[in-house]
């Protein structure tokens, strides 16, 4: 994701060149730099921060975000703008914003929705929150939603709720149809007629073709479980009823148990099939 985003910033963002890159695995940054050109790989995170006015981060999980900012905060960062496109919980985003502000720096939370293919095609949905002046500095790329950084993460989590509910709905529809003796082809036609556009069409294709069991994952189930954990925490904190989401998360756990942590998120279909007395996968040896 970060590689696709940095490529688009370089190609279309009218940024100063060379673009400074940093990755904890230096070999990845070197290979990415060689492929793109007009890039410079920093030897360390503080070195990357020191020569940059805007520092854009996209990290794997909340632990990586917290560790990275622990390394950044002692440096001279006054007047620098940090844009974080990682997915954390809202409290973490607000805490980082406060700590950066105490050091005279600025922060925009910019979680994104969509996988690497959408990032490459410049089709990600970006949700920005931060003080107005900071958001204005990156406005050529996004539309802001407010001044509290945690608001962006809340919207990202709500977006994930919609995604998981959609996957669960499509999976249950297919399993229901099969148990009733409806041919997969006819159910596919119905879904494409009623919901011809993404996301329903995308998840339907994954399930009908069997790619949810054997293809390259849209999102690994292990990462989906991390994110759904944040959503469940938010729902519990605010007293919200999210029963369909709870069921979808339980199905993710079943997927991980049966197909491993790298299985696709849409293999929820397999969990629903098992509960309906069908084989987990539609693919036969």
Swiss-Prot record:
<dbReference type="InterPro" id="IPR051265">
    <property type="entry name" value="HIBADH-related_NP60_sf"/>
</dbReference>
<comment type="function">
    <text>Nonribosomal peptide synthetase that mediates the biosynthesis of usterphenyllins and uscandidusins, p-terphenyl derivatives. Within the pathway, ucdB alone catalyzes both reduction and dehydration of atromentin to form a terphenyl triol intermediate. The pathway begin with the biosynthesis of 4-hydroxyphenylpyruvate (HPPA) from L-tyrosine, possibly by the aminotransferase ucdG. The nonribosomal peptide synthetase ucdA then condenses two HPPA units to produce atromentin.</text>
</comment>
<feature type="binding site">
    <location>
        <position position="87"/>
    </location>
    <ligand>
        <name>NAD(+)</name>
    </ligand>
</feature>
<feature type="active site">
    <location>
        <position position="156"/>
    </location>
</feature>
<dbReference type="GO" id="GO:0016491">
    <property type="term" value="F:oxidoreductase activity"/>
</dbReference>
<protein>
    <recommendedName>
        <fullName>NADH-dependent oxidoreductase ucdB</fullName>
        <ecNumber>1.1.1.-</ecNumber>
    </recommendedName>
</protein>
<comment type="similarity">
    <text>Belongs to the HIBADH-related family. NP60 subfamily.</text>
</comment>
<dbReference type="GO" id="GO:0050661">
    <property type="term" value="F:NADP binding"/>
</dbReference>
<dbReference type="InterPro" id="IPR015815">
    <property type="entry name" value="HIBADH-related"/>
</dbReference>
<dbReference type="InterPro" id="IPR029154">
    <property type="entry name" value="HIBADH-like_NADP-bd"/>
</dbReference>
<dbReference type="InterPro" id="IPR013328">
    <property type="entry name" value="6PGD_dom2"/>
</dbReference>
<dbReference type="InterPro" id="IPR006115">
    <property type="entry name" value="6PGDH_NADP-bd"/>
</dbReference>
<keyword id="KW-0560">Oxidoreductase</keyword>
<dbReference type="Pfam" id="PF03446">
    <property type="entry name" value="NAD_binding_2"/>
</dbReference>
<dbReference type="GO" id="GO:0051287">
    <property type="term" value="F:NAD binding"/>
</dbReference>
<dbReference type="Pfam" id="PF14833">
    <property type="entry name" value="NAD_binding_11"/>
</dbReference>
<keyword id="KW-0520">NAD</keyword>
<dbReference type="InterPro" id="IPR036291">
    <property type="entry name" value="NAD(P)-bd_dom_sf"/>
</dbReference>
<comment type="pathway">
    <text>Secondary metabolite biosynthesis.</text>
</comment>
<dbReference type="InterPro" id="IPR008927">
    <property type="entry name" value="6-PGluconate_DH-like_C_sf"/>
</dbReference>
């Amino acid at each position: 994701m970060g590689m696709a985003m940095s490529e688009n910033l370089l190609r279309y963002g009218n940024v100063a060149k060379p673009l400074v890159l940093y990755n904890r695995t230096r070999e990845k940054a070197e290979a990415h730099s060689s492929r793109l050109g007009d890039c410079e790989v920093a030897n360390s995170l503080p070195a990357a921060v020191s020569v940059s006015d805007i520092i854009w981060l996209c990290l794997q999980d909340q632990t990586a975000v917290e560790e990275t900012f622990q390394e950044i905060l002692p440096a001279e960062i006054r007047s620098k703008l940090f844009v974080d496109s990682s997915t954390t919980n809202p409290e973490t985003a607000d805490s980082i914003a406060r700590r950066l502000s105490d050091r005279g720096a600025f922060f925009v939370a910019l979680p994104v929705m969509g996988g690497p293919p959408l990032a490459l095609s410049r089709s990600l949905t970006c949700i920005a929150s931060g003080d107005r002046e900071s958001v204005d500095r990156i406005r050529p790329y996004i539309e802001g939603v407010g001044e509290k950084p945690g608001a962006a993460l809340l919207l990202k989590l709500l977006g994930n709720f919609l995604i998981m509910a959609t996957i669960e709905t499509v999976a249950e529809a297919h399993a229901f149809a099969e148990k009733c003796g409806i041919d997969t082809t006819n159910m596919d036609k119905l879904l494409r007629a009623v919901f011809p556009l993404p996301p329903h069409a995308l998840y339907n294709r994954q399930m009908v073709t069997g790619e949810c069991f054997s293809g390259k994952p849209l999102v690994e189930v292990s990462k989906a479980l991390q994110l759904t954990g944040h959503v469940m925490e938010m729902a519990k904190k605010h007293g919200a009823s999210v029963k369909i989401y709870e069921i979808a998360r339980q199905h993710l756990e079943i997927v991980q148990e049966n197909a491993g942590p790298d299985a696709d998120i849409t293999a929820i279909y397999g969990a629903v099939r098992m509960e309906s007395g069908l084989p987990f996968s539609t693919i036969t040896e």
